Amino acid sequence: MGITVLKNEGLDFHARISTPLSEIDDDIQKELLDLTKKVKIAGFRAGKVPVSIVKQKYGTSVRNDVIERRINHSVNHVIKKHNLSIIGRPKIEALQNEPDKALAFTVKIELLPKVTIPDLKKISLDRPKLEVNAKDVEEQLEKLAALTKSYTKESKAKIKDGDQVTIDAIGYIKDEAFEGGQLNDLKVVIGSNALIPSFEKQLIGSKTGSEVDVNVTFPENYHSKDLAGKEARFAVQIKAVHTAEPTVIDDEFAKKFQSNSLEELRTHFAKQIENESEEAINTIMKMNLFDQLEKLLDFDVPASLLEQEKNILKSETDKNNQDESLLKDKSPKEITEYYNKVALRRVRIGLLLAEYAKSKNLQLEPDDLRKVIMQRARNFPGQENMIFDFYKNNPSAIEGLKGPALEDKAVQYIFNNEIKLKEKKYTKEELEKYLEAEEQRITLI
């Protein structure tokens, strides 16, 4: 085997590899001889088929198999000989494969960069800590009470905010009834904003038995394109009005929600508020850590990984319509520069965390994958079971989670063992403002 290194610079390794014709012919002959003992051809006894007949029938496929094995063997030999850390599949170019000539080809291999882990103990970050107070808990209790109001008391008085109204209605555009504009026995709580803007307000002051004309304009983003932005009139008949029975927040109320007492329900809500903030805090902390890591990393990255990450980034942009805000009014050049910068950051940090996990011998446990699946499921409220079933029935999808799961594990290890964390306390209102500002800042990074 002849090996000529054509390029060994940065993350590119190119070599020209050749194998003498005699070695190729020897391999082919050996394969054909082996086949004479195995194949069955009409007119010949088993194991007695002449090589010439086998070659005539199987020669092309045997040669192709031999060439493929030789190429794979040669490439693997080069990788081991030069101790290459490769990424992706080597590319084979300029293949010389004529039957009367030596086998020759050029292999182009993309290399992983040498990643040096910086001194992470020099990094210092603030860690937000939510202090849940009694007011936060009472607000949650009041919201729960509002959601479980009982509307059993019929009212003959004028409709006011908070009443539940039962209506029939027919919608008209330019005095013509439109499809989907008929409402029958619809129950709506005034002030809930369940209907299109201003509809509910125009019912205030009416009584049971009244007929009211309600004039509205459908929002520009209304789900029906035929109605979006159009003015309409609804002829509404008030069929019934019910006022809410006051909800007493006590131990009996708590028992409706699997709590033995009101105090137990309060404790549950306090923990829930804290847990809900933790995921958002962890996401922000992770991005803040990445901000610091980005300043410490300057190694080259494989072009294929960079291109792959840019494509993912563009897909995320399209999916989330971020181009309407973040990239609005940007020139094509500025957008390209933005994609390049963010993709480079992501790839560098991903390679660093992979190297860090390797250096600390971090191994994935089943619970690590379960956490990632739970995080994905929380992004689809009401469809959690569908997400769980998808991953349960698709092992290949689970494979795709191993990278993010190991990255999360490495990040948590860094938080727990490397960097300096300074706890900074926030009230619920303060934390919500902080998280909102941070989420806008870290969009698409």
UniProtKB/Swiss-Prot annotation:
Tell me where it resides: Cytoplasm
Q: Which GO terms describe its biological process?
A: 'de novo' cotranslational protein folding; cell division; chaperone-mediated protein folding; protein transport; protein unfolding
What GO cellular-component annotations does this UniProt entry give?
Answer: cytoplasm
- What GO terms are given for molecular function? peptidyl-prolyl cis-trans isomerase activity; protein folding chaperone; ribosome binding
Keyword Isomerase (UniProt): yes
Report domain PPIase FKBP-type positions: 162-247
- The top EC class, named as a word, is isomerase
Q: Name one Pfam family in it.
A: Trigger_C
| Major location category of this protein | cytoplasm
Q: Which InterPro entries match?
A: PPIase_dom_sf, PPIase_FKBP_dom, Trig_fac, Trigger_fac_C, Trigger_fac_C_sf, Trigger_fac_ribosome-bd_bac, Trigger_fac_ribosome-bd_sf, Trigger_fact/SurA_dom_sf
Domain of life of the organism in this record? Bacteria
The reaction(s) this protein catalyses: [protein]-peptidylproline (omega=180) = [protein]-peptidylproline (omega=0)
Q: Does the keyword Electron transport apply?
A: no
Q: EC annotation? A: 5.2.1.8
Record keywords, A-Z: Cell cycle, Cell division, Chaperone, Cytoplasm, Isomerase, Rotamase
What's said on domains? Answer: Consists of 3 domains; the N-terminus binds the ribosome, the middle domain has PPIase activity, while the C-terminus has intrinsic chaperone activity on its own.
Q: Which HAMAP family match?
A: Trigger_factor_Tig
Q: Which family does it belong to?
A: Belongs to the FKBP-type PPIase family. Tig subfamily.
Tell me, in a sentence or two, what this protein's role is: Involved in protein export. Acts as a chaperone by maintaining the newly synthesized protein in an open conformation. Functions as a peptidyl-prolyl cis-trans isomerase.
Identification of the protein by name: Trigger factor
Which species is listed as the source? Answer: Rickettsia akari (strain Hartford)
Q: Source taxonomy lineage?
A: Bacteria, Pseudomonadati, Pseudomonadota, Alphaproteobacteria, Rickettsiales
What is this protein's gene name?
A: tig
